[in-house]
Regions:
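Conserved CoA-thioester-binding segment of acyl-CoA-metabolizing enzymes
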Residues: 1-38, 81, 347-348
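Hydrophobic/aromatic residues within transmembrane alpha-helices
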Residues: 37, 50, 105-106, 161-162, ...
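Glycine- (often His-adjacent) and acidic-residue-rich active-site loop
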Residues: 39-78, 128, 334
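Glycine-rich beta-to-alpha active-site loop
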Residues: 83-127, 149-155, 159, 170
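Contiguous mid-protein beta-loop-alpha structural module that forms a pocket-lining wall or clamp
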Residues: 134-196
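Amphipathic alpha-helical blocks and their helix-capping loop/short-beta junctions
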Residues: 173-258
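Substrate-recognition/cap regions that form aromatic- and gly/pro-loop-enriched pockets
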Residues: 235-246, 250-296, 300-302, 306
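C-terminal amphipathic alpha-helical interaction region
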Residues: 291-294, 299, 303-348
Length: 348
């Protein structure tokens, strides 16, 4: 259980280390047949990483290396990789707010339960970060241009959308959690991880949700989303979104997410997703660490966090006023590994 309710269970470096160590221990403990990951309180599974701590690290050593932030990313991505490659069944109860690093944990689990209270998002463009924690992997798995849309607009989605785009595997009502836990205890577990994966799959498929799915937001708008996000030219995408003049409140929020987000972040998000499309999971996390470390060494991120979470004026002064003024060669520098960055150290 992620247990810092007052911060919506935001991840710190210490929490990442504890989760990683515990998962590694349980992987070889024959008495552990499956792992369920949840969050304390009713509001959130996990609202992401502690971005204020990352900002402080970025400000302490302008230009880098940013010790706390960069080692946080390295450890967090190792944890994400462990989740994705874990042999035993991993069940995530993704209730309430599931953002950023929280979504990374959810996406890494084979069984991803969402409820009527689930609110998922990757709002990184708002603070000049990027959808990391494997986002370059799972956003690229989605049909059409949904992944690109979520990354560039910071749109929030619900349980129906999560099932539609693959972030959720099962829907249960929030009040069914005790029943799920009781049923897990009663199962006929075996000695092999493969058998126990089947046990969990059959169990989850067998439980009927006690409530209704929320109204879908993505599926009925998929045609517009794909039209907005098609093509290989980010400027054209930006101009299409900016020119849209519909009366759909949800799409208007998405439009504002792109138009008000960091232009520099839009550029590196677009490039990272494109160059990761055919990458392996290992290559995804390696490239995300390079980009994450370089972002920490640039002032754009600290300004984004300042405007949203510190001064809360929601009026960031971005390095570049618009996408047209973002030089390609500047964007390219974010994808060159700094010589003094920490090693990712994924297991062979």
């Amino acid at each position: 259980t992620l247990n810092v309710e007052k911060t919506l269970n935001s991840l710190t470096r210490e929490m990442v280390d504890i989760i990683s160590d515990q998962l590694a221990h349980w992987a070889t403990n024959e008495r552990v047949v499956a792992v369920l990951i949840d969050g304390a309180g009713e509001k959130a599974f996990c609202a992401g990483g502690d971005v204020q701590a990352l900002r402080n690290s970025s400000l302490e050593t302008p230009g880098g290396p940013c010790d706390y932030a960069e080692h946080f990313f390295a450890r967090e991505y190792r944890m994400n990789y462990l989740l994705h490659t874990y042999a035993k069944p991993l069940i995530c109860w993704g209730h309430g707010v599931v953002m950023g690093g929280g979504l990374g944990i959810l996406a890494g689990c084979r069984y991803r339960v969402v409820s009527e209270r689930t609110r998922i998002g990757m709002p990184e463009i708002t603070i000049a970060l990027f959808p990391d924690v494997g986002g370059s992997w799972f956003l690229n798995q989605m049909q059409g241009h949904i992944g690109r849309f979520l990354a560039l607009t910071s749109s929030h989605i619900n349980a129906a959308d999560a099932l539609f785009c693959g972030l959720g595997s099962h829907f249960l009502s929030n009040d069914q959690k005790p029943d799920l836990l009781n049923r897990l205890i009663e199962q006929n577990w075996g000695a092999s991880a493969e058998h126990n994966q089947d046990v969990v799959a059959v169990l989850l498929n067998d439980i009927t949700p006690s409530g209704a799915l929320p109204e879908a937001q993505i599926a009925p708008r998929l045609e517009t989303i794909n039209a907005w996000m098609s093509g290989s030219d980010l400027i054209e995408i930006y101009e299409r979104v900016a020119a849209w003049a519909g009366d759909d409140t949800w799409l208007s929020k998405a439009q504002n997410g792109l138009l008000q987000g960091s232009p520099l972040a839009a550029a590196w998000i677009f490039k990272q997703l494109n160059q990761s499309r055919d990458a392996s999971l290992r290559e995804v996390f390696e490239s995300e660490l390079v980009l994450g470390c370089n972002i920490m060494r640039h002032p754009e991120f600290a300004e984004g966090v300042r405007a949203l979470l510190v001064d809360k004026d929601r009026n960031p002064v971005w390095t570049y006023p618009n996408l047209l003024s973002v030089p390609n060669d500047v964007v390219d520098t974010f994808f060159v590994a700094p010589a003094d960055m920490p090693a990712l150290g994924l297991p062979e």
